[in-house]
Amino acid sequence: GANEKASENLTVVPLTVTIAGKDFLDNEDLNMEEFLTSMEENTEEGRTSCPSIDEWLKALEGSKRAVMLTITSGLSGSFSSAYQAKQIYEKDNPGSKVIVVDSRTAGPEISVIQREIKRLVEDKSVRFVDIEQKISEYKTHTHLLVILQSLHNLALNGRVNIAVAKMAKVLNIDVVGTASEEGKLE
């Protein structure tokens, strides 16, 4: 996610958010202040683009084992493109094993899941083939709430009634949300 530092063992494959014709990559180089200002000042619907299969494949290059964690499939095609990349990569690289995890969430909870994946990968007592099941179990016990300070972008994208968004702004109401079992914002 945004501002998540890439390292020797972690590669960020970013989503692209397009606002008023300007692309913002959701990676460590994202200028959050500029991004949020653009969202707030924008009067048109923004767009998001998930990473392509080729972008996932590039991130996998040279890996014998990899775990790919995506934003919820309830909001993005990232899981689908990552899973297709996994299938291609494993076919083209016999002996490789790729695990694709649908976070079923967005925001800070993804970082919590990512840290648990890292812990499991580094734990010599955990077999790589068991990581997928362990993460699935872990996700059932991990839930974070999201506070939306503005409904502006959701209203532009038709996910919230524009009158409700304006009323929330006038009354200075922050909305609390969470992800459903399917990974959709509630």
Question: Model-flagged regions — what are they?
Answer:
Residues 50-54, 149-150:
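Short coil/turn segments at secondary-structure boundaries
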Residues 52-89:
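N-terminal glycine-rich phosphate/adenylate-binding segment common to multiple enzyme folds
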Residues 94-96:
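A short helix->loop->beta-strand "cap" motif at the edges of active sites that frequently abuts
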Residues 1-17, 75-78, 83-87, 99, ...:
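Mixed-charge interfacial surface used for oligomerization/domain docking
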Residues 1-51:
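N-terminal glycine-rich anion-binding loop in soluble enzyme alpha/beta folds
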Residues 68-70, 98-102:
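Short acidic, glycine/Ser/Thr-rich loop/turn "cap" segments at secondary-structure junctions
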